Curated annotation (Swiss-Prot):
This is Porphobilinogen deaminase. GO terms for biological process: heme biosynthetic process; protoporphyrinogen IX biosynthetic process. It comes from the Bacteria. Its cofactor is dipyrromethane. Tetrapolymerization of the monopyrrole PBG into the hydroxymethylbilane pre-uroporphyrinogen in several discrete steps. The porphobilinogen subunits are added to the dipyrromethane group. Keywords: Porphyrin biosynthesis, Transferase. Transmembrane segments: none annotated. It comes from Pseudomonas aeruginosa (strain ATCC 15692 / DSM 22644 / CIP 104116 / JCM 14847 / LMG 12228 / 1C / PRS 101 / PAO1). The lineage of its organism: Bacteria, Pseudomonadati, Pseudomonadota, Gammaproteobacteria, Pseudomonadales. Pfam families: Porphobil_deam (PF01379), Porphobil_deamC (PF03900). CDD domains: PBP2_EcHMBS_like (cd13646). NCBIfam families: hemC (TIGR00212). Pathway: Porphyrin-containing compound metabolism; protoporphyrin-IX biosynthesis; coproporphyrinogen-III from 5-aminolevulinate: step 2/4. The keyword Nucleus does not apply.
Amino acid sequence: MSSREIRIATRQSALALWQAEYVKARLEQAHPGLTVTLLPMTSRGDKLLDAPLAKIGGKGLFVKELETALLEGAADIAVHSMKDVPMDFPEGLGLYTICEREDPRDAFVSNTYASLEQLPAGSVVGTSSLRRQAQLLARRPDLQIRFLRGNVNTRLAKLDAGEYDAIILAAAGLIRLGFESRIRSSISVDDSLPAGGQGAVGIECRTADSDLHALLEPLHHTDTALRVTAERALNKRLNGGCQVPIACYAIREGDQLWLRGLVGQPDGTQLLRAEGRAPLAEAEALGVRVAEDLLEQGAEAILEAVYGEAGHP
């Protein structure tokens, strides 16, 4: 990396490119004269679209190729959706910036119905997420959940083709891509607790690039980072990836963080919940503590069953 050029590794989906362009614009605004270019790449998770995420297995489905570009020197930073970022990083890489969070909620999208409550019994709802599935079926066991993968445009097209009565997507992705009008209703975090890091964008780079860390500093949002740190600590203690029925969401209350966590049976028959509060400086310890509460309630058995069915740890 020259001191006046930064190369961004990014996935090729419309949402990933939006996030990379957002980081590019922020960097160029903060550092006039800086040249920022994009290096679009295809991840393993992007290639394997014919199976649910939980069946594919492994962590880092959407980031490993980008990390390879960093390690080989082909790129200087990688821009990720925080909910896709594994808890541990390859030697020589680290997460140095978390940008301000967009709406973290799940969105109900339908061409016929205004809300989840309005769906008739037997309606077909599309999602690729066991987390969403567990919470949906806990509220509405009369619904049919059908597998849904692909980028945002593909998922909307499948809904429009009549394959589903409704689909559930992250509100942040729809908002960022200009599809906010497709959101019929945003689902309260009380009814659908988000994935850890949902709605936040993270920037990964080489640990040795201290000059680059300084350039990234204006993009870092401390409030978001504290909240996401607690969420990721919970995920790490539960050995969770982006394809397991784990939910967690932290908010700041003055000088405290309030973290809620959930582990659910994919069929919705059991939802384990835990929560806790701690000073801002103890975000990581808070995540571990809430995770321990879930484990004491029996979360490990639920997660082991999911991992066993998927055929991976």
